């Protein structure tokens, strides 16, 4: 096919340089680096050797990655606990590590306040009390909150402040728990 080419296979030294380039571009988990290196490696053993070397030099640390990623997604993007956990798992962070990082990041967080802030940001310049009287808009707001990683209970508690029909949302299937 035109436009697609097979990447050049690299030896251990080439993989080392490639891994530094990858990590220089953005933070990656060990699983992500392993996957990217495996595509370019001549030998599978070279991948593990490069990953071990990256860890020895302190360039690759899933604990630090998970901690910073979880706090970034919470503080700067306003996502809820479940969304951050799902994203960490998609980024190939070990489940126990991801759970611990998310628990630490959300330790002293009031989810209701987070939901309020999320709604205020997503529905800027809109009267939520008026908008959410419409069933479709209420359901849409609920789905947005669930997709953003907020629990059903916190989402409904906040939405009740704007629309009495929010109690009926509990019967809907959850977006992703």
Where are these regions (language model features)?
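An alpha-helical, amphipathic repeat domain used for nucleic-acid recognition
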Residues: 1-177
């Amino acid at each position: 096919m035109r436009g697609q080419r097979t990447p050049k296979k690299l030896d251990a030294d080439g993989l080392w340089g490639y891994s530094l380039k990858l990590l220089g571009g953005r933070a990656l988990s060990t699983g992500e680096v392993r996957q990217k290196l495996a595509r370019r490696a001549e030998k599978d053993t070279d991948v593990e050797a490069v990953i071990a070397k990256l860890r020895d030099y302190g360039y690759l640390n899933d604990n630090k990655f998970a901690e910073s990623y979880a706090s970034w997604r919470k503080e700067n993007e306003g996502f809820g606990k479940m969304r951050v956990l799902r994203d960490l798992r998609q980024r190939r962070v070990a489940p126990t590590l991801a759970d611990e990082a998310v628990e630490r990041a959300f330790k002293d967080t009031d989810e209701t306040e987070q939901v309020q802030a999320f709604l205020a940001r997503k529905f800027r310049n809109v009267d939520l009390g008026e908008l959410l009287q419409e069933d479709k808009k209420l359901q849409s707001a609920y789905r947005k909150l669930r997709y953003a990683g907020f629990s059903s209970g916190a989402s409904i508690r906040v939405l009740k402040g704007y629309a009495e029909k929010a109690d009926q949302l509990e019967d809907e299937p959850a977006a992703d728990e």
